[in-house]
UniProtKB/Swiss-Prot annotation:
InterPro entries, per the entry: BCP1_family
Basic and acidic residues bias: start-end ranges: 8-18
Superkingdom per UniProt: Eukaryota
Name the UniProt record assigns to this protein: Protein BCCIP homolog
Subcellular location: Nucleus; Cytoplasm, Cytoskeleton, Microtubule organizing center, Centrosome, Centriole; Cytoplasm, Cytoskeleton, Spindle pole
Role description: During interphase, required for microtubule organizing and anchoring activities. During mitosis, required for the organization and stabilization of the spindle pole. May promote cell cycle arrest and DNA repair.
TM spans (from-to): none
Region: Disordered, residue numbers: 1-59
Taxonomic lineage from the root: Eukaryota, Metazoa, Chordata, Craniata, Vertebrata
């Protein structure tokens, strides 16, 4: 599956070149030197903010994607006790579903990379059926993480609901993973989700692992202004206060049956909003857990499509 989405990238900073005439002027006139510095800074700023269009394509997840997927999973789970390596291996083993986002290759790139066993992964999408994989170490750790954070941040009634859903074998829960680097645009997520839904339908029809899911469990990277949170529980955060690292997660949030947020401030190295384009307002990093009925997926995709068309 190919995507027409484009990525905004920042070019490396570099000093502007000066010709001999400029150098002579700098040696002879201090005021000219000041003007040149200002001009250079302006040129550098223009270079840094220059947009570079890169074509992305989605590929079947393979062994060469292992390190890239691990890196993205570490951004999601941070210091949580989840076996990232085992989870990555699981995603690679069940590669009849899911895709890795990579830069589209030209023939020249392909020839140059013949000896390179590692692909650069900009994002990926996949799903782990928590019910089918019950007993697998990383799956049990994910369930324990959700329930523990729920106990710490929510009322007991919410904990009981999550516990019931995660341990109900008659209504399988799929852990939906859609991760990408922050500078990869949201436009690429729509075809990725649509392709995954097709793959899940094929999987169900052919009785392959993953099968039908009654619910989707989503762990989303979110943020809130530090001034708007207390030192106590985070729990049920108002939607208008949450900022989503992945724009499409907002539409999952709107349709979620159960949801709560918890702080990861002590686990995260990023505490300033500037890195996330939130105007340098001090931000508190959160993780937002959402349980979404599978039959609401079409509605979510419609909302996402509408959002991208504006």
């Amino acid at each position: 599956m190919a995507s027409n989405a484009k990525r905004r990238a920042l070019e490396p900073e570099r000093l502007p070149e000066r010709n001999e005439e400029e150098e002579d002027d700098m040696e002879g006139d201090n005021s000219d030197e000041s003007d040149d510095i200002e001009d250079d800074e302006s040129e550098e700023e223009e270079e840094v903010n220059e947009e570079v269009n890169i074509d992305f394509e989605a590929y079947t997840i393979s062994d060469t994607d292992s390190e890239g997927i691990k890196k993205l999973l570490k951004q999601l789970f941070l210091k949580a006790h989840v076996n990232i390596s085992e989870l990555t291996d699981l995603l690679i083993q069940q590669n009849h579903i899911g895709s890795a986002i990579k830069q589209a290759e030209s023939q020249e790139d392909s020839d140059d990379d013949d000896d390179d066993d590692v692909d650069h992964v900009f994002g990926f999408i996949s799903l782990v059926n928590l019910t089918e994989r019950k007993g697998t170490s990383c799956v049990e750790q994910i369930k324990e993480l959700i329930l523990t954070r729920c106990e710490e941040n929510c009322e007991q009634s919410m904990v009981e609901q999550f516990d019931k859903v995660l341990n109900n074998n008659s209504k399988p829960v799929g852990f939906l993973l859609s991760e990408r680097f922050i500078n990869v645009p949201a436009q690429i997520a729509l075809p990725m989700h649509q392709q995954l839904q097709k793959e899940l339908a094929d999987t169900q029809r052919t009785n392959k692992p993953c099968g039908k899911c009654y619910y989707y469990l989503i762990l989303s990277k979110t943020f809130v202004e530090a001034a708007k949170t207390s030192k106590g529980r985070v729990g049920s955060q108002a939607k208008e206060e949450l900022m989503f690292a992945n724009a499409e997660d907002e539409f999952f949030y709107e349709k979620a049956l159960l949801k709560f947020s918890y702080s990861v401030q002590e686990e995260s190295d990023t505490q300033l909003g500037g890195r996330w384009s939130f105007s340098d307002v001090p931000m508190k990093p959160l993780r937002t857990v959402m349980l979404v009925p599978a039959d609401r997926m079409n509605s979510i995709m419609d909302k996402f499509k509408e959002y991208l068309s504006v």
